[in-house]
């Protein structure tokens, strides 16, 4: 397992298309943050999805939950913008050096997704997309980040020199695929929690509550599509049950599919997951297109 992670971390994977560095010249020390558009043929008349790969907030599964997803969306007539956001790094997963140094942690990740939403909307005309049909899809920890963008859109974390955003930071829809949700209790995914909050932050009940998605569903939460699998060995399947209940209690339009099999980390693969769980791809496309009929 560790060898596989090391390979994924060290491999140089370059997405196709023009890569943009949204923090360029802004002194955020975030040169590794990149966004790459994958535009459909009729790009101005279809939704756009910002894709957030998973990786426990320590690394990014850039291939299986990033590039392949963006290409799949584009090939199905949906624009994609692949976001490579800041993570704690694989080193922090092994050596716990953030006991001594800040490293990467919250709010770095939500800064990156908000900066991406802002950049894409402000540059929608030159990018060739519709800024009013812009959503976010995330996998595992990326699903937590996608939901965070919906839950905290009224707080501008970007702190740009020109001031608060004049465009909405709220995504128009969210796809949460086998997401991390809660930071509390027996169902919390501890590695993601540590990646997000830091070595000291995990001991703070205030910080755990602050980043537990189920505690922060806003009145204006956009529609949510969510799936996971009962046999998930990585992120306990109750995370999505918790989110489903929170969305239901808040009256948020959403679709939740719980598959019996499929495990975790299958993305849009034709190989990984199960025949049952791979149905999520068609279900998502039907759901998304239904939002704009």
Language-model features and meaning:
Residues 183, 231-235:
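Acidic catalytic loop of the alpha/beta-hydrolase fold
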Residues 115-189, 208:
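Primarily recognizes the serine-hydrolase "nucleophile elbow" in alpha/beta-hydrolase
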Residues 9-43, 107:
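N-terminal cap/lid segment of alpha/beta-hydrolase-fold proteins
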Residues 61-68, 84-131, 272-277:
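Catalytic nucleophile-loop/oxyanion-hole region of alpha/beta-hydrolase
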Residues 220, 226-228, 232:
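Short beta-strand/loop motif that positions the catalytic acidic residue
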Residues 25, 163, 179-216, 222:
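Mobile cap/lid helix-loop segments that gate and shape the active-site cleft of serine hydrolases
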Residues 46-54:
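Short beta-strand element of the alpha/beta-hydrolase
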Residues 93-96, 227, 237, 241-293:
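C-terminal catalytic histidine-bearing segment of alpha/beta-hydrolase fold enzymes
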């Amino acid at each position: 397992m560790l060898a596989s992670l090391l390979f994924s971390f060290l491999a140089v994977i370059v997405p196709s298309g023009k890569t943009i560095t949204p923090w360029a010249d802004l002194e955020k020390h975030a040169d590794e943050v990149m966004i790459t558009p994958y535009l459909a043929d009729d790009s101005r008349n279809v939704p756009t999805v910002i894709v957030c790969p998973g990786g426990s907030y320590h690394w990014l599964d850039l291939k299986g939950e990033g590039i392949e997803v963006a290409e799949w969306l584009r090939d199905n007539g949906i624009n994609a913008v692949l976001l490579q956001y800041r993570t704690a790094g694989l080193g922090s997963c092994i050596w716990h050096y953030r006991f001594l140094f800040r490293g990467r942690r919250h709010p770095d990740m939500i800064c990156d997704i908000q900066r991406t939403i802002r950049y894409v909307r402000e540059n929608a005309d030159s990018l060739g997309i519709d800024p009013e049909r812009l959503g976010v899809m995330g996998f595992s920890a990326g699903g937590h980040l996608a939901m965070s963008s919906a839950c905290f859109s009224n707080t501008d974390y970007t702190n740009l020199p020109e001031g608060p955003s004049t465009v909405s930071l709220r995504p128009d829809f969210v796809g949460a695929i086998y997401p991390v949700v809660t930071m509390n209790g027996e169902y919390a995914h501890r590695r993601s929690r540590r990646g997000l909050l830091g070595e000291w932050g995990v001991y703070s009940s205030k910080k755990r509550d602050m980043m537990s998605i189920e505690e922060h569903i806003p009145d204006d939460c956009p529609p949510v599509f969510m799936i996971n699998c009962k046999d998930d060995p990585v992120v306990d399947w109750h995370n999505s049950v918790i989110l489903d209940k929170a969305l239901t209690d808040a009256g948020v339009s959403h679709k939740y599919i719980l598959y019996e099999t499929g495990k975790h980390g299958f993305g849009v693969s034709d190989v990984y997951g199960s025949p049952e769980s791979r149905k999520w791809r068609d279900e998502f496309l039907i759901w998304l297109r239904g939002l704009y009929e």
